[in-house]
Amino acid sequence: MKETFIHPTALVEPGVELGQGVSVGPFCHVQSGAIIGNDCELMSHVVITGATTLGAGTKVYPHAILGCDPQNNKHKGGPTRLNVGVNCIIREGVTMHKGSDNARGYTSIGDNCSFLAYAHVAHDCDIGDYVTFSNNVMIGGHTSIGHHAILGGGAAVHQFVRVGHHAFIGGLAAVVSDLIPYGMAIGVHAHLGGLNIIGMKRSGMERKEIHNLRHAVRMLFDRTKPIRQRAQDVLAAIPDSPTVSDMISFINVDTKRAYCTPPLDAAHGGAGHDSDED
């Protein structure tokens, strides 16, 4: 394992926990209490507050600022944290805020995530593994992003919204409602534009499961019954599909937001814009 390197112009305060093989570049500032895992690299002009933990192998590009106070007037300055997983890529100008003391108290980032230039993660968010934020993505406080989700450039997600795993949000979309697993949100305000078929294929999902999800979405969003009742109808019609069960579990969780739905003129709430099916 390589030796830890700290550039002469960097400020690493006493009380920082540095792993083996860490590289701290020019003009970085790492505050007391920060935990930097093995083989992390801070390129230059990076600020890591003492409320931050970086998992091993994470690389942070210039002018990123991690772990500052939440932009939440209810936060009273109590001890909270930002926890970043292993092998993440955090590009130029990214900001991530720690949690609030009036909420769950920490912001969590999963493993193997990529945050492209100037993306923003607000307080108390929960982000899964293998998530991609494209340039200038912004998510509000208390937002939940599932594993393998992709957020296109300039997309904005309202506070408290839940985005399911393997979902896709198009560039410049404004998402104000919960997005189902495997769903695709497009537009301002964003609507459900179908399923993330390309992402499902890339993940190796079987064709049968893709068909099951298509059927489930058509049933869920036909607007003839309350959505929780429709969800039970879906389980009865497609009882043995793990992906459909995941989707229905997402629907059945209590939420502060509505659901991202197809446009009113979409026939039977169908899966428009997901035509990349074999």
UniProtKB/Swiss-Prot annotation:
Family matches, as InterPro entries: Acetyltransf_C, Acetyltransf_C_sf, Hexapep, Hexapep_transf_CS, Lipid_A_LpxA, Trimer_LpxA-like_sf
Q: Which Pfam family, giving just one, matches this sequence?
A: Hexapep
**Gene Ontology CC terms, in alphabetical order:** cytoplasm; membrane
> What start-end ranges are recorded for coiled-coil regions in this protein?
none
Where found in the cell? Cytoplasm
- CDD domains from the xrefs? LbH_UDP-GlcNAc_AT (cd03351)
Q: Which pathway does the UniProt entry assign to this protein?
A: Glycolipid biosynthesis; lipid IV(A) biosynthesis; lipid IV(A) from (3R)-3-hydroxytetradecanoyl-[acyl-carrier-protein] and UDP-N-acetyl-alpha-D-glucosamine: step 1/6
Descriptive protein name: Acyl-[acyl-carrier-protein]--UDP-N-acetylglucosamine O-acyltransferase
Gene responsible for this protein: lpxA
